[in-house]
Each structure stands twice: as C-alpha cells, then as structure tokens.
C-alpha cells in the first residue's frame, strides 16, 4: 500500500470541500485492510508494518475530518509555511473583530445571553471561514491567502475553547 499524502491514501481528491461520508467510508476500507488483527499470525515485521499503516490511516482521518486541520494540511502540502507560532500578522479588520470578541468573552463570563450570543457569532465565523477556504483553495488555488485564513480560524477555535471553559456565573 503506497500513498504520498492523506488524500491519496483514501483515494480522494485533494480538496478542502470533502464529503464526510465518503471520507469515513474510505477510512473504514483502509483501516479494515491494515487492521493489526488481520496480521495476528504474520511475522513480527509484517505486524509492525500493519500497525504503522493503521496509525497512519487514523492520523490521516483525524486531520481530514476536521475542516480546520484539513485546510492547514492542504496549505502545508502546497508548501505554505503557516508559521503559527511566529507569524501573528493579520488583517486589521480581523484584529478589530478579535478585540470585540475578547470584550464579548468578558461579558459572557457573567451573562448567559452574552455567552449564547458569542457562541452563535463564533459558529457563524466558522461557517464563513469554511466558505472562504473552499473558495481560496478549491476554486482559486490561493494557498498563501488560505494560510492567512487558517491562522485566523485558529484564533476563532482558541476563543471558542475559552468560551466553553467560561460558563457564565448565574
């Protein structure tokens, strides 16, 4: 079994827009072929290779089923260094939005209505990110700009995690 990337491992096109049902079916087919139990009576080397393929299939599935990780993977495969730790440069409008969301997060800690409003706003931001990334990657092939959007999406996800941890005080 040879596959150069996660998409070819599952026989899927390298696209951001991906049918989750097709992805799961492809993963199940690959996982069934390389499941270590199928190699219980094989040599130690064959069992080790099966285990490595199973781990690879599981990791590929984990990355491809998460839209943000899939976008990140596609950008990296296209040679874009996302510099997630060092590159904090973002669009000024998005920076202003970040500040607004941070203020809303402070309110959300005290107010259930503010909590619900911010959660809904972040969900809308996720949907917009997915639409934008589908256009940038699948339609325009603009991986550099897609990388910028992935960094923005990472901020949205981090804020969503903080929101989940910040249940409003009743």
From Swiss-Prot:
Entry GO terms, CC: iron-sulfur cluster transfer complex
PROSITE patterns: DNAJ_2 (PS50076)
An example Gene Ontology molecular-function term: protein-folding chaperone binding
Pfam family, one: HSCB_C
Gene3D superfamilies xref list: DnaJ domain, HscB, C-terminal domain
Keyword Chaperone assigned: yes
Transit peptide among keywords: no
GO biological process, one term: protein complex oligomerization
Residues covered by the J domain: 5-79
Alphabetical UniProt keywords: Chaperone
PANTHER family membership: IRON-SULFUR CLUSTER CO-CHAPERONE PROTEIN HSCB
HAMAP family according to UniProt: HscB
Function: Co-chaperone involved in the maturation of iron-sulfur cluster-containing proteins. Seems to help targeting proteins to be folded toward HscA.
Family listed: Belongs to the HscB family.
Record's subunit section: Interacts with HscA and stimulates its ATPase activity.
Name under which the protein is recorded: Co-chaperone protein HscB homolog
């Amino acid at each position: 079994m040879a596959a150069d990337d996660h998409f070819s491992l599952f026989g899927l096109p390298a696209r951001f827009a991906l049918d989750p049902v097709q992805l799961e079916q492809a993963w199940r087919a690959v996982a069934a072929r390389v499941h270590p139990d199928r190699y219980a009576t094989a040599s130690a080397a064959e069992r080790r290779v099966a285990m490595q393929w199973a781990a690879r299939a599981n990791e590929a599935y984990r990355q491809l089923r998460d839209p943000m990780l899939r976008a990140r993977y596609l950008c990296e495969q296209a040679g874009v260094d996302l510099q997630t730790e060092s590159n904090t440069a973002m669009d000024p409008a998005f920076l202003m939005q970040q500040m607004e969301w941070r203020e809303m997060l402070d309110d959300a800690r005290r107010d259930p209505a503010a909590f619900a409003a911010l959660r809904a706003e972040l969900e809308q931001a996720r949907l917009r990110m997915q639409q934008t990334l589908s256009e940038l990657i699948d339609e325009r092939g603009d991986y550099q700009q897609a990388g910028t959007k992935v960094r923005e999406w990472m901020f949205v996800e981090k804020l969503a995690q903080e929101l989940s941890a910040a249940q409003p005080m009743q």
